[in-house]
């Protein structure tokens, strides 16, 4: 069982709400730090191990700086994420730039910042050389194993159907071209799963990359210096799910590392992950208030939050656990659809969910909203994105992003010539 708790009491929460009205996202600073330390320590056996935080998960400079202090880098996929890194002070090889269908302006910024370029497309070698004039001495190449790897979901897709990465044949050709053009340092990357809780599946991804590195060494004489295993380490969204044990995962990867890489003379390959979801996801909460009850063919609880605050349930049908503050131990003897006010019928945080009796004014907490929550927010239907708060170990709170206003919403419109 995966007990779902909150890092504040009802009294603490009411004090926070007195200053910052609902809805808002709040992140548990201590939880993020301790979880990240645990992950990094699990892989301490690998001398060059690096975790790059997937900025897209929670693109907030406070979160990024928090992780930077732990030695965590940044996995960027867009110009905006690169600019965030620049403002935080994350540069050089502390950035892995993993993008696709990439405009040159984004490559240009990544190269100016000294980021490692993770090539998604073999044609981008020529594209970069033509537009930039020269290539850096370090490259990573994204591998799409196709039918060799099962899995995928609506986010990543089945490998053979996904738009990402290169085939095995293209990987070898890309390495030949890059070496001929003077590139000296090579890496492999793959990302074929998302929100994976099965450790065997995660280790299988590592084995896939390790075998590829061995084949590259044998066939091309090129030594792969680093292997980025992507993200994909999952979050146990449901109470009955078991979170990934970092120690068990690390042991599985280490066994494969020794069996495949070390056994073939590749003793010093640095490993990396670019996790985002598991870093902040379990330590973020969407705090809302029940403002309406409606009884027709079903029983509805209307919140002051909507899918503009958390899109995952509507977009993916994802489960997010719900706690009603002060009623944690009350019997779950009511069945509700928990909704927002968007003019879309899929604006539902829960469908036919067994919950305690909810009254108007109750504080409703939506769990595991720390990744791909606020960052996937939007303004459709004129909705405003909510504030982000950081809860410190001593119980104090820092607002790390203010709530949007209607002035923000209309700021790009020109009313002067109406």
State where each predicted segment sits.
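Active-site loop/helix belt of alpha/beta enzymes
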Residues: 145-291
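Conserved, mostly hydrophobic/aromatic
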Residues: 32, 56, 78, 110, ...
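Charged (often Lys/Glu-rich) extended helix/loop segments that serve as interaction or gating elements
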Residues: 262, 266-418
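Structured core elements
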Residues: 73, 96, 118, 140-142, ...
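Glycine-rich, aromatic-flanked loop segments that form ligand/cofactor-binding clefts
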Residues: 134-148
